[in-house]
Amino acid sequence: MFFAAALCCIVSAVMVSCGKDNPDTPEPEPTPDPEPEVPVTPKDTVVYAVGQEAVPGKGYYYATIWKDGKRILLSDGSYDAFCNGAYADGETIYIAGCEATGDLVDDGYYEPYHQNVGVIWKFKAGEEDKAEKTVISDGKYSTSPIAVTVADGKVYAAGFDSPDYDRRAILWTDGQPQYLTDGTTDALAYCIYSDGKDVYVGGYVQPASNKQGGIATIWKNGVAQSLTSGNTVAKVNAICVDGGKVYAAGSEKESGGRWKGVLWIDGVAQDFTDYVGTEVTGLYVKDGEYVIEGNMTETNSAKDICPYIWTSAGAQKVAETTLCQGVGLAVAGNDIYVAGNEVAGYDSEYNPINIAYLWKNGVEQELEVEYKNDFSLWGVICAYVEKK
């Protein structure tokens, strides 16, 4: 599926002959000293899965990460919190998420609740207990940063807020928001990717002329590019840049219909599934070979949702689960990690049982949990850290 690059060194020997009786024969150039070899630092692959775990008896969640399966809490359980996405910049890890610590809302319909505030956690791998938290919204409106990246020394996050019924897509730069849409129609930002100094955000924008439609959209450095016309509902859920080409994976459907999977390469669409309820949450591309991750149904029934990956060779089911969504992808060498969430039934009090999974090459990995009936993942990354 993936092709490892091999490094070949070709050494040429040049024979120089000098005639002793010819005074015009130039002296040979001195052989330069060889460049010193730069030692390669051995690296370990560390896998971070991010999400949430229920605080027992409280009805809300801890913001939780799992480092190689070990559970680590980023919140103290005194309020609702969760992690949406992550990024590794060398050995520095960034987590995008939310905490319900904003303005109190009492609308008369529900129990009073606090608005979600957008946050970014930052820590060095191995120093998770020293995580620094940066709040990136004021708590006035519910705010959700979904994804995070780093480019040219700056931290970028993509997500949305909800000042009214229609949401606004947002790009944050070092905590400062740039509104990609103005809120006059609905819009969401689902993903972010950096390539050099360029930052790409993927999502959707509802056209003003068709409230039943949705335009799959990429914002490059804040400038929007529409991938669809708005006559259908379409969205970009994951972006990669490889070989100078921009790959965007997402879904498209007719209003009221079922989703099909779409991969856009430099804006040109190619379908990778039929209209079978396909959702995308991950994309990896190297040397033109892609891996798309998400879920789809096999029988057009919502009860038959399974996690999948798609490559140029076709579709591959990740696990034999039902009512299970694929929610995250990471690739390290030839290893493929997929995160998923399953609705596994109901407990004795008719509360849904939510169980998260992390698979490595299709094999379930152990996740440490204290409350096994209600925990979820929303992303997974691989970090490369120096061997101790």
Predicted regions and their residues:
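Bacterial Sec-dependent N-terminal signal peptides
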Residues: 10-45
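Residue-level hotspots at or immediately adjacent to binding/recognition sites across diverse folds
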Residues: 39-388
